[in-house]
Regions:
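SH3/SH3-like beta-barrel fold
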Residues: 19-23
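A conserved beta-strand/loop element that lines the FAD pocket in flavoprotein oxidoreductases
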Residues: 1-9
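Active-site substrate-recognition segment that forms the wall
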Residues: 9-16, 27-67, 71-163
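Secondary-structure transition/capping residues
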Residues: 3, 44, 135, 139, ...
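Hydrophobic/aromatic beta-strand patches that form the interior of the parallel beta-sheet core
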Residues: 4, 34, 166-168
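Generic recognition of stable, solvent-exposed alpha-helical segments in well-folded globular domains
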Residues: 4, 119, 123, 178-181
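C-terminal lid/capping helical subdomain adjacent to the catalytic/cofactor pocket in oxidative enzymes
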Residues: 162-167, 171-235
Length: 235
């Protein structure tokens, strides 16, 4: 196995015998391709104009001291998700850091700006103040964003896309859990196995064509703002 890290694929030429992935520094040739590249799958020749790209953001503290842990009840590592999906996810990691996640934004061009991360960090600080007012003064050590892909109809990509081309994408907001399940099932499918997961995923609806990007962006921004406000104290 050869792993090419930090190697952007600019285009793919799907051929009858060999597929050619064109990069800045050369070509990678493969008989078979598995596309597991989230929204970028729509730039790889399949399901164009279907992705609703959204960024969600997280912030994490430095490791807490024993006194700081005592001040919040000396909890063991935990993870709490909100009843309202646009509320705040809160975790205490094994290395004693608090991690908060909320804020969604439309990712024009599948990208996020530094100003978007700074805005999210301010919202995370509000959530920190609300939950642990005496501890919140320590702030955050790191803040970041990550891309997730939605479809207007909630559809997902899974299975054979072309001759010796397979794909899995559009986890619709649960990338770790669904991504793991998609990846395992896709590998099984490629080598000719059968499983209940393959059967379920193969019968899920595919992403439908979305509205024009400018309409989608307005809709996503309005919806996320409303849902964030509706979450109330869970944000």
């Amino acid at each position: 196995v050869k792993v090419y890290e930090n190697t952007q694929v600019n285009s793919i030429d799907y051929g009858p015998q060999t597929h050619i992935c064109v990069t800045e520094n050369g070509e990678i040739r493969a008989r078979q391709i598995l596309l597991c590249n989230a929204a970028y799958l729509t730039k790889s020749g399949f399901f164009s104009n279907t992705a609703i790209p959204v960024y969600t953001y997280g912030s994490i503290t430095r490791p807490l001291t024993e006194d700081e842990l005592d001040s919040i009840g000396s909890p063991k590592p935990f993870g709490v998700i909100p009843a309202e999906s646009f509320g705040t996810t809160l975790r205490l990691t094994n290395d004693k850091r608090l991690l908060l996640r909320n804020v969604f934004s439309y990712a024009r061009g599948f990208k996020s700006k530094t100003s978007d991360i700074e805005y999210a960090k301010k919202k995370h600080q509000v959530a920190f103040d609300r939950r642990y007012p005496d501890l919140a003064k320590i702030g955050y050590e790191h803040s970041w964003g990550g891309l997730l892909t939605l479809a207007q109809n909630g559809g997902m990509v899974f299975g054979k896309l072309g001759e010796r081309v397979y794909g899995a994408a559009f986890c619709n907001g649960t990338g770790v859990a669904r991504g793991t399940a998609f990846g395992k099932a896709l590998a099984e499918l490629v080598v000719g196995q059968n499983s209940r997961s393959i059967e379920i995923l193969s019968n899920r609806p595919k992403p439908n064509y979305g509205l024009p990007n400018w309409i989608t962006e307005i809709g996503v921004r309005a919806t996320t703002k409303y849902r964030f406000m509706k979450s109330g104290l869970e944000t």
